[in-house]
Amino acid sequence: MKPGKKIIRVAAMAAAVVLLLGGVSLAEGFLLGEEGTGATVKVAENTSLNVRITLQGRLDAGDLIKSDEATPTSYESESDFSFRRIRLAFTGNMVKNLTYNLTIAADKNSVAPGNASNTLRIWYAWVNYKFADPLSITFGKIKLPYSRVSLTPATKQLLIERPFSTEAAKTLFDDYIQANLSLNGKLAGGTIAYSLAAADGWEPGATVSGNRVHKSGLLYLGRLELSPPGWVEKSKSDAALGKGRHLTLGVNAAAQNGIEYASNAFEEDRTLWGADLSGHWQGLTAQVEYNAWKEDYSDPSKVMKEPKGWYAQVAYFIPGVNVEPAIRYEIYEQDSNKSDTEQRTITAGINWYLKGHDVKLSANYARTEFEKNANGFLANDDKQNIFQLQGQMMF
């Protein structure tokens, strides 16, 4: 049996098992009870501390490695067990309207087997002061405000992995989660929401495009979200578990100019813009997002690079059995200034919620096809098939 067909058969069997087992929870609510909020200690009237632990165990199988040759020509099957995410989060209020978060992570650093070192590091560290709904200020190590699917917590993703294009866009300004200062607010009952931020981006000493950075301008970012009255999302989630409704249009832009190299007189500018539309009504959820970015070099030996990509995903939460089949289609053009650099990915999956997002099991099958000039294309193999199983627990 061909590897691709074998993976599809295993995925189908896993989905059938989930549906079968889900039948034991036909009663209202989740099999293991409702979602929790972690452990909270209230020190004083406006002072509190909440502690949450997140664990994501993962099995990846399929075309995970390349052939053992000087120049690989095909993909080979392999499997890999890992803890994709291990998080310990401390969140609370120091005084009224002053919120803080410190998250320690020991995530797996790569989805490829053999590259998994669960290195302990600070993931988030920020403080936020809310003056009023229209204005709050945040400083610390936190996500940069662009890309809807990237801003959504990993624990509330619809599918196990985020799209390739948005993952690539997250590296445009060095770390996606970096120290930044932002102004945020909501107007008109949340129908208008905004975020304006400034960060270092590529800073002195970092290596960008093969060159060490001497100095650079600041990175500026902005995001705007618009929702109709009565359709405002309380917090970002790919999967609302059949509750409520929302409809949100988001647009974002970012730019960092004057990234000067230390070894020569050249420099580069980087810009990004994107738009997304997301919505859900009870069990039905859908989302589409587009991002395009540019790396503009003053070095005449380098050609301006302009990647772009989009995806669309849809799912339906089935109450009673508490399962959610989902599908996503994506096109990522690695450089629109070159021909045949597209990769197309279709991902099909199913989630089984035993305690909402606190305890859930997910199974995904992803198939990617590469054009001849795209990274990932091999002489004897232009397709990659991967099957994933993941269990998530938060407490």
Task: Identify the meaning behind each predicted range.
Residues 2-12:
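Bacterial N-terminal signal peptides that target proteins for export
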